[in-house]
Regions:
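A short LG(V/I)-centered, amphipathic sequence patch enriched
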Residues: 14-31
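Alpha-helical linker/hinge and terminal dimerization helices associated
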Residues: 16-17, 38-60
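A late-sequence structural motif
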Residues: 79, 230-271
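Hydrophobic hinge/microswitch elements
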Residues: 102-115, 121, 174-232
Length: 271
């Protein structure tokens, strides 16, 4: 900007303010008391604007920000962890906040803005405010320890399951409700001898032969391959389900979240 243009802009500002901001003499120009006061505040304002622009640039280019996720222990450990590792390597300056809660608690955090996205066990009740995207198909299978090896070879009918000691997740779990619903639809009521809040504990208890339990097959491959657990075929089997990503509709997606979602390998849509 040329000097005449600067001088004209200052005079226009003085006219608008109704007071001279500069004292002009043959030896130079210096600010009036009003000019000094205005400059002090404008300097702060311009500094804040510049800082805001820099922070915005950093967020857009993934140089700062926060990724806030809600999910259960099982989903975090068996599905999200590899993506979180890759994300952190790509964007080390993004703060990652993962809150481990049940499906319903995660949805509550999503609705109150505490997290930007949930990765939860499906299905959930339809809600027009939620955008649900399946991520991976999973299969619930019945397993037992060495004591039940013969049962694994023979298989069983669901109606006979109440004859055996059963270990299940607590009834607040969406996975537990899914198993209960499956059993009830087939005329069977499940009465576990023990209810636990952790899938890992169910696996550990089943390994020491405390009872049978339902696990997610895809997340229990190591125990099955090492023969610490044995899959018991049940007729009818539990219908397959999915782990899904849930976001609030009509809510802008933070750049930090978009960068994470771009890493996830979603199932291809079938024609």
């Amino acid at each position: 900007m040329s000097q005449p243009a600067v001088s004209m802009s200052i005079r226009q500002l003085e006219d608008r303010m109704g007071s001279p901001l500069l004292v002009r003499t043959a030896k130079g120009v210096y600010p009036t008391a009003e000019g000094k006061l205005l400059y002090t505040y404008l300097e702060q304002a311009l500094g804040l604007i510049q800082a805001a622009e820099e922070k915005y640039y950093q967020m857009v280019h993934m140089e700062m920000g926060e990724l806030k996720i809600g999910a259960s222990d099982t989903v975090i450990a068996n599905f999200l962890l590899p993506y979180l590792e890759k994300y952190h390597k790509l964007y080390p300056d993004i703060n990652i906040k993962v809150t481990n809660k049940t499906t319903y608690e995660s949805l509550r955090l999503l609705r109150n803005g505490s997290v930007d996205v949930c990765f939860i066990n499906l299905p959930i009740a339809e809600d027009e405010d939620l955008e649900v995207t399946p991520c991976i198909e999973i299969h619930d299978v019945l397993v037992g320890g060495e004591r039940y090896r013969m049962l694994a070879e023979m298989g069983m009918e669901l109606k006979d399951l109440p004859k055996y000691p059963l270990l299940l997740l607590e009834d607040l779990s969406n996975s537990r409700r899914y198993i209960d619903r499956y059993a009830e639809e087939n005329g069977v009521v499940l009465n576990p001898i023990l209810e636990l809040g952790s899938s890992d504990l169910l696996v550990s208890f089943a390994e020491i032969n405390l009872g049978l339990t339902y696990v997610i097959e895809e997340f229990t491959q190591r125990e099955l391959q090492n023969k610490h657990l044995f899959e018991i075929p049940v007729e009818p089997p539990v219908p397959k389900r999915s782990i899904g990503m849930v976001r609030l509709k009509n809510v802008a997606m933070p750049h930090a979240l978009k960068g994470f979602i771009d890493l996830i390998e979603f199932p291809k849509e079938k024609n």
